[in-house]
Amino acid sequence: MSAQPVDIQIFGRSLRVNCPPEQQDALNQAAEDLNQRLQDLKVRTRVTNTEQLVFIAALNVCHELAQERGKTRDYASNMEQRIRMLQQTIEQALLEQGRITERQGAQFE
C-alpha cells in the first residue's frame, strides 16, 4: 500500500509525515518514545532550547543503536562459533560411526 499522511505531535509541535498504513502504530509509538525522551532530557539537563534537546536525543539514540549493533555482532559471532563446534562434533561422530560400521562389517566376513 502507498504511504498516507499522518499527523503526529512531537514536543508540542504538529508534524505531518507520510507513512504506510501498516506502520502507523509503530510511528505513533516512536513519536511517544521521542516525546518521553525529550521530556526526560529537559528535566535532567534543564536545557530549554528545543533544538538542543532534539540534538541531544538524536545523539543518545545513535549511541544506543551503536551499542545494540555491537551486541548483535557479538551474538552472531558467538553463534557462528557454536555452529562450527557442533559441526565438528557431528563430523567427528559420523567418522567414528563409519569406523565402527567398517569394523563390524569386517567381523562378518
Curated annotation (Swiss-Prot):
Residues 21-99 form a coiled coil. The keyword Cell cycle applies. One of its GO terms (biological process) is FtsZ-dependent cytokinesis. Keywords: Cell cycle, Cell division, Coiled coil, Cytoplasm, Septation. GO terms for cellular component: cell division site; cell septum; cytosol; plasma membrane. It is found in: Cytoplasm. Belongs to the ZapA family. Type 1 subfamily. Homodimer. Interacts with FtsZ. This is Cell division protein ZapA.
